[in-house]
Design a protein with these regions (language model features):
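A beta-strand edge to alpha-helix "cap/lid" segment located at domain peripheries
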Residues: 1-17, 67-142
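A generic helix-loop boundary/linker signal
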Residues: 12-15, 27, 55, 59, ...
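Hydrophobic alpha-helical elements and their junctions with loops/disorder across both membrane
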Residues: 29, 35, 52, 103-105
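A solvent-exposed, acidic/Ser-Thr-rich amphipathic alpha-helical stretch
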Residues: 34-92
């Protein structure tokens, strides 16, 4: 028997075009594929990170998102990853529900932090940005 592991980020026949695009962005972010990220996102994406979450504020443009938000967030942790497990298609908005997996130190145990991401999609299929809400208490408790 063939043991094939299927990831929630793999495309399935029932996925809409917009869900496929959001899944492609999560895969590109995970592999740090800058060319693909720039192809998927609009030129000036907006990351609206919930107040109370580390570095929570609104980031506009690639340099603020990747040179500001992610750089500051990653300086606080040893590892960080977003693992969506459900996608909901709302037309020009795709909601992803999942968990961040965070370790704060080299020897620390991973902590799971629930999140909801609402991704805006423009008329050309490019992602405009994200509205993020997460369980900040879990992040700070770790």
């Amino acid at each position: 028997m063939n043991n094939v592991q299927i990831s929630v980020l793999d495309e399935v026949v029932s996925d809409s075009k917009n869900i496929r695009q959001v899944k492609a962005l999560y895969r590109a972010l995970k592999t740090k594929d800058q060319q693909l990220i720039q192809k998927i996102l609009v030129d000036e994406p907006v990351w609206d990170v919930s107040p109370g979450f580390p570095e929570g504020e609104i980031y506009r443009g690639m340099s603020e998102v990747f040179g500001g938000f992610y750089q500051k967030l990653l300086a606080r942790v040893h590892t960080f990853g977003a693992f969506p497990d459900r996608f909901i298609d709302g037309g020009d908005t795709v909601v992803a529900l999942g968990q961040y997996q965070i370790t704060k130190t080299n020897s620390g145990l991973p902590v799971l932090v629930r999140f909801s991401h609402a991704w805006g999609i423009d008329d050309t299929g490019r992602i405009k940005g994200v509205w993020q809400v997460a369980d900040s208490a879990q992040f700070f408790a770790s």
